[in-house]
Amino acid sequence: QNAYEIRAEKKKEGLTGFGESTCVLKNFPDKGKVTVTEQVVETLLYEENMPKFSWKLTNKDTTILGYKCFEATTTYRGRTWRAFYTPDIPISEGPWKLCGLPGLILFAADSLNQFCYEGVGMTNDVKHPIALKTKKCRKCNAKEMANMLSLLSKDLDEFFYRLTGAKPQHFDASGKPTKLDASFTACLKEEFDK
């Protein structure tokens, strides 16, 4: 299965598209830092130190985009990740926060296949400096962002109240007050209660 097939399956299961509005900037604003933003009504932002991964290298290999890649596994914030990296591109980076292998990560997935990243092409055509898309952000930490995204799937009124300070009111067709029901399951990359 490729990333698109896995994503389509997850959408059928009712899992949200969290992460589609996530931006991860490594070594930004300073070396050794990671900045993460998530666009939900307004932009949430947190900065933290770059994670240090303890990768276990295996003997498994495959070919991705014409590059011979080798497998490695690690655990980070409640998830076990499997990655394939290529030493032919000696850049110790990868998708999302994943990094620290002796080559570029061209494929990564968590053990439940809820999150999957697969290289589909490469270009060396960078014309714009790396920067935040918006300067107006609500600062938080990683756990607070995860809690807000989880709340978004459970209690929309409370989510909007915490975000805006205003209690939304909802009415049915006859004018009677009603409550919005969240109708999806939050699927977060980072788990803090495990």
Which residue ranges define each predicted feature?
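Extended soluble regions of mature proteins
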Residues: 1-194
